Amino acid sequence: GEIFLELIQKFYDIETVVISGKGKWFDNADVVTTFLIARKRNPNTPINQNRTISFCTLKESINEITDVKQLSENILLETDNQFVAVQNYSVNEITNFETIGVPWCGYFANLNWLTEVSEKLIDCNQIFKFTRGERRGWNPLFYPASGHNIEAEYIRPVLKNLRGTSGLYCSADGEAFCCSRSIEELEQLNHTGALQWIRSFENQNNETGVPLTQSLLRANMFWYEMKTDNMADFVANVNYDKSLFIATFVNRSFIDQRMIGLSLKAEFQTEDRVLLLALLNSILSMFFIESFGFGRGLGALDLRATKFERDFKILDFQSLSDGQKQAITDAFQPISQRNRLPLEQEIEQADRTNFERVLLEIFGIAEHYDAIKASLLHLYKIRFAVKD
């Protein structure tokens, strides 16, 4: 998407982007359609930084709008009315939004609050090391079923998915086989459980008939080896539905490839985990998750791990006093102890409203609460418009 936008803007001035906020336009599609109105430009001339681009969201189903000509005129005239919501941003403003990390799919919302709030944020990659579960290619070997008899030192807890997690705390729901010892070492140690496990796969082939001893080979690794570098403290989904959240492990755990792990860097190991959990699950963090993803179809949200690692931000807690940190964790405590709710219900809960107001007040941006909430809801509803 980023490469496409960069390329098209070299040859065209994008003037208007239109998306449906109420139902899909084509019955044979499971995604919401977006179209661009653009004017050809001379690629050798500088881009006018003050030129505005309009981002229009249709408020009604296109099948229910009887006067399409009037609608078209409203879009071209950048007029906000009962049928279309319009946000206008200059090229310079968009460049600033991109620097902050919010991509084009976020510009259908009102982002007039974003520049001021961004001064209070910190890149999460300064605090966390991001990890992904390893894709080793043969789950029966690397994720043993119960009764395997492998020695405990080669077994690590693993979270396969977050479907069984109803709150913000999660625990491993499976086991992973992680052995970096050679066959000779295992024989010397008489670790027969691991040896028998490895040998039970030695003569097996993968789906294409290639022996596992060849298909699973990696540089500087045994064919049966899986690294444990991606143990995580917190975990985010790659695919979100109606609940936007980042969970924390009761005990650090290994993660499956379908999730994004966040491991605290050494200098932040002593930081209060509940404080970090609160910041990762604020309405502001939910906005970033929603704006970073793209609709995969039928309302599902896909996150690109590279984008998430590069641009995900939280409020910068480093200059807060101990009293301010305590006030945040106290306000967050009721949320952390209950089940999560679908977003539209979640943000209306009394404990959620209290937490967000306490949090934003401490950071001096409480006046933006309603705008942040409205922006999040606007993008969320666009994603689910395909189901309308």
Q: Language model features by range: what are they?
A:
Residues A327-I328, K373-K381:
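Short linear loop/turn motifs
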Residues T95-E98, V102-D330, P334, R340:
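Polybasic, glycine- and aromatic-enriched phosphate-binding surface used to engage nucleic acids
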Residues I3, E309-D370:
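Extended amphipathic alpha-helical segments enriched in small hydrophobics
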Residues F11-T16, K40-N44, N205, L284-F288, ...:
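A generic secondary-structure signal for well-formed alpha-helical elements
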Residues K313, I372, K381-D388:
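Non-globular, low-complexity intrinsically disordered regions
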Residues G1-R136, Q257:
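Signature of N6-adenine DNA methyltransferases within the class I
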